[in-house]
C-alpha cells in the first residue's frame, strides 16, 4: 500500500462523517418543536440531523430552505460560518430524492466552491445526509486523484462538489457533462470572483441548461458577482442574514500602533494566549517567517499557505483543529478553507488592503454565536488609513499607541511568552501526529467538526495553465 493510500484510508477512518454515516440504530426522536421539521424537510433528514443533536436551524437556514424547497432561485447574503452549507444542502438533497435514475458522467446537482479545503468540508458536512437519502456524491478538486474522480463520475453521481479549475479540467477531458444539472449552487461566490475565477464560473454556468434552479451565496455582490446574478438567475428571492458588517458588533476590536522594532515582541504577546488563534500575513514567505519567529519566542505556531504540499496542509489544519498547534499563521487565500467555530482571536500582523478584507478576516472568529477578538497591528504612519478603514467596516474603535507589555496589549487576552525557543524536534511531531479519531464539535452551521481527506497531487491540465492572475491560484483550484 502506498503512502497516499494509507493516508486516504486513515483520514477516512478518522472522519466523523465516515462514522456517522455508517452508524447503526433506530431513528432519533424528533420533538414537536424541531425547527428543521417545521421547514418542511423530509423526516429521514430531520431524524439524521437530530441524531447529531441538530434541531434548531440558523437564521440563514430558516430563511432560505423553504424557498429553495419550492424551486425558487435564491440569493443568500451571509458571512462564512453562518450555516450556509445546510441552507443549500438540505433542500438540494431533498429535491434530488425524486427517484430519477442517475446517468454516467452527468450529475444532477452541482456545488461550486472556491478552494479544495472548503470543498472537502462541504462534502464532509453533506455526506451523512446524502448517505441516508440513498444518493451518491463526489468531491472533485485540485490536489486529489484524477483517476478516482473520473471513475466515480463514470459510475454516475447525483451531487457534485467541485472547485472551478478542476471542474473545467474534467469538462475539457470529457469526464463530466453538465447538461443534466438541475440545481446549481455557488458558495462564497465573492471569494471565487476575488480569486480570478469569473471566467471559469461563466464557462461552467454556460454549460448548464437554462431553467434549472440556482442558489448563490455570497457575503458581497461586487467583483463581478452582480453580473453573474443578473445573467444566470431568474427572479431570485434574496435573504440577507448575519452579514459580515453586522457581525463585527459581536467582536472586540483592537488597533495597536507600534514602532517597527516592537513588532515581533507585540506579535508574540498577542498570540501567546489560550485557545485557537489565527494570524494573518500578506505573503507565503511572511507566514513562514512569522511562525518561525513565534516559535523562537516560545509560542507554538505553524504556517499555512498555498506553497505547501496538500499533505502538509492537511496535517497542519488537523493539528490546528485538534489543538496540538494553537496558533495558525495563514495567508488570506489559505484561511478561506479554515472553518473552525472556536477561534477566539484573529491577529492581523499587517493592516488588510481594505475594509472588505478586514471583514473577511474578522469572520474567522465570533462564529456560531461565540464571541471573539480582532487585533490589528499598524505603524504610526498608517493611523489615518486604519481610521478610514474602520469607519468603512462599521467598527467603533480607535487606534492606540503601545509598547511591549503595555496594558492595552495584554487586554487582548495575550501574555508575555516564555522566550524559550521551541525546537524543531518538538514542533515537527505535533504536525506529523496521526489525527485523533473523534467526532467534531457539532453546531447547526455549515461545517460541524469536519476532517480533511488526503488526496494525490493534482495532475496537469491539458494545454497548460493560463498565465496572469488566475495562475497564482493554481494550488487553490
Language-model features, listed with the residues they occupy:
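N-terminal intrinsically disordered, low-complexity tails of helicases
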Residues: 1-63, 477
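Arginine-glycine-biased low-complexity disordered regions
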Residues: 4, 28, 296, 322, ...
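Conserved nucleic-acid-binding Ia/Ib motif block in the N-terminal RecA-like helicase ATPase lobe
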Residues: 47, 54, 102-172, 180-183, ...
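Walker A/P-loop NTP-binding motif
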Residues: 62-74, 85-103, 120, 125-129
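Pre-Walker A (Motif I) flank of P-loop NTPase domains
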Residues: 70-76, 106-109, 158, 274-276, ...
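The conserved Walker
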Residues: 78-82
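Interdomain coupling/hinge region of P-loop NTPase helicase/AAA+ cores
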Residues: 110, 129, 137-140, 149, ...
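Walker B catalytic acidic pair
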Residues: 164, 180, 188, 331, ...
Amino acid at each position: 500500500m502506498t503512502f497516499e493510500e494509507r493516508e486516504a484510508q486513515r483520514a477516512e477512518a478518522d472522519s466523523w462523517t465516515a462514522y456517522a454515516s455508517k452508524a447503526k440504530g433506530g431513528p432519533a426522536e424528533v420533538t414537536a418543536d424541531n425547527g428543521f421539521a417545521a421547514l418542511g424537510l423530509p423526516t429521514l433528514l430531520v431524524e439524521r440531523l437530530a441524531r447529531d443533536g441538530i434541531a434548531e436551524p440558523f437564521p440563514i437556514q430558516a430563511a432560505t430552505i423553504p424557498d429553495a424547497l419550492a424551486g425558487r432561485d435564491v440569493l443568500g447574503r451571509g458571512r462564512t460560518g453562518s450555516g450556509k452549507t445546510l441552507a443549500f444542502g438540505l433542500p438540494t438533497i431533498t429535491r434530488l430524492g425524486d427517484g430519477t435514475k442517475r446517468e454516467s458522467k452527468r450529475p444532477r446537482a452541482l456545488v461550486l466552491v472556491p478552494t479544495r479545503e472548503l470543498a472537502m468540508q462541504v462534502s464532509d458536512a453533506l455526506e451523512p445526509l446524502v448517505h441516508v437519502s440513498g444518493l451518491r456524491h463526489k468531491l472533485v478538486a485540485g490536489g486529489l486523484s484524477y483517476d478516482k474522480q473520473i471513475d466515480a463520475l463514470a459510475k454516475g453521481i447525483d451531487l457534485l462538489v467541485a472547485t472551478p479549475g478542476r471542474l473545467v479540467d474534467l469538462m475539457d477531458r470529457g469526464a463530466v457533462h453538465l447538461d443534466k444539472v438541475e440545481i446549481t449552487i455557488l458558495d462564497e461566490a465573492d471569494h471565487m470572483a476575488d480569486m480570478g475565477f469569473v471566467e471559469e464560473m461563466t464557462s461552467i454556468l454556460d454549460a448548464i441548461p437554462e431553467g434549472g434552479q440556482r442558489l448563490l451565496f455570497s457575503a458581497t455582490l461586487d467583483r463581478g458577482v452582480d453580473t453573474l446574478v443578473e445573467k444566470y438567475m431568474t427572479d431570485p428571492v434574496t435573504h440577507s442574514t448575519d452579514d459580515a458588517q453586522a457581525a463585527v458588533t459581536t467582536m472586540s476590536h483592537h488597533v495597536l500602533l507600534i514602532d517597527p522594532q516592537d513588532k515581533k515582541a507585540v506579535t508574540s504577546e498577542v498570540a501567546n494566549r489560550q485557545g485557537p488563534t489565527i494570524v494573518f500575513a500578506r505573503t507565503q514567505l511572511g507566514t513562514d517567517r512569522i511562525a518561525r519567529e513565534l516559535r523562537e519566542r516560545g509560542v507554538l505556531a505553524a504556517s499555512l499557505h498555498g506553497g505547501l504540499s496538500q499533505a502538509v496542509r492537511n496535517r497542519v489544519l488537523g493539528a490546528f483543529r485538534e489543538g496540538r498547534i494553537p496558533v495558525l499563521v495563514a495567508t488570506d487565500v489559505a484561511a478561506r478553507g479554515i472553518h473552525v467555530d472556536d477561534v477566539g482571536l484573529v491577529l492581523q500582523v499587517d493592516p488588510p488592503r481594505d475594509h472588505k478584507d478586514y471583514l473577511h478576516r474578522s469572520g474567522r472568529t465570533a462564529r456560531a454565536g461565540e464571541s471573539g477578538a480582532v487585533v490589528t497591528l499598524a505603524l504610526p504612519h498608517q493611523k489615518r488609513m486604519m481610521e478610514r478603514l474602520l469607519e468603512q467596516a462599521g467598527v467603533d474603535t480607535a487606534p492606540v499607541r503601545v509598547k511591549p507589555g503595555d496594558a492595552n496589549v495584554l487586554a487582548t487576552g495575550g501574555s508575555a511568552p516564555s522566550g524559550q525557543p521551541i525546537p524543531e524536534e518538538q514542533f515537527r511531531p505535533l504536525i506529523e501526529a496521526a489525527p485523533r479519531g473523534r467526532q467534531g464539535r457539532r453546531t447547526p452551521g455549515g461545517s460541524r467538526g469536519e476532517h480533511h481527506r488526503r488526496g494525490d497531487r493534482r495532475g496537469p491540465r491539458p494545454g497548460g495553465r493560463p498565465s496572469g492572475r488566475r495562475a497564482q491560484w493554481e494550488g487553490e483550484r
